[in-house]
Amino acid sequence: SLHDALPILRCDADSINFMKGALCYSDWLTTVSPSYACELQMPFFGEGLDGIFRRRSNILSGILNGIDQGIWNPATDSMIPANFSPKDMSNKAECKRALQEELGLAQDPTRPLVVSIGRLTNQKGLGLVRYAMDGLMARGVQVAVLGTGDADQEEAFSYFSNTYGNPMCARIAFDNALSHRMYAGGDLLLMPSEFE
């Protein structure tokens, strides 16, 4: 009964935490990565529940996020302009050229093209990317960002795209087909994270 569970759910004299109850009564606890499972056991990341995560660490596991190679395989992907593989990279350059053209970037095979695809949220560590943007642009790097999220992040990347023009493109949208072309055409994948 709820009355019996109150001592477990209670955070302090005036409040209860149903998440605490879920953590205490669950048969298994999973998170988005093994490192985040460790971080949750620390006061800074545990949000007051770190003690429970430590006590229940024997049933706490992180399932590493990853890419489905059956769907995101450049050797077989029908959403990209040309297929390639680690053993035959000859068509990779065509994917980059086509992406540069689509995004309005200079079609220059010698310029590094950094792509970032994902949620534009503070937890993703985009503050560091924003801080480094001037330096990237000064070095002749092309940057392409695709995603949606927090309004301040969306505005910042739209600002960079408008300010820097040609070497910077921000598409504030969810576009699965474009994400395939960006993974295939980019030279470097930027996937920052503040934590997890």
Can you say where each PLM-predicted feature lies in the sequence?
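Catalytic cores of nucleotide-sugar-dependent glycosyltransferases that transfer UDP/GDP/TDP-activated
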Residues: S1, A5-E196
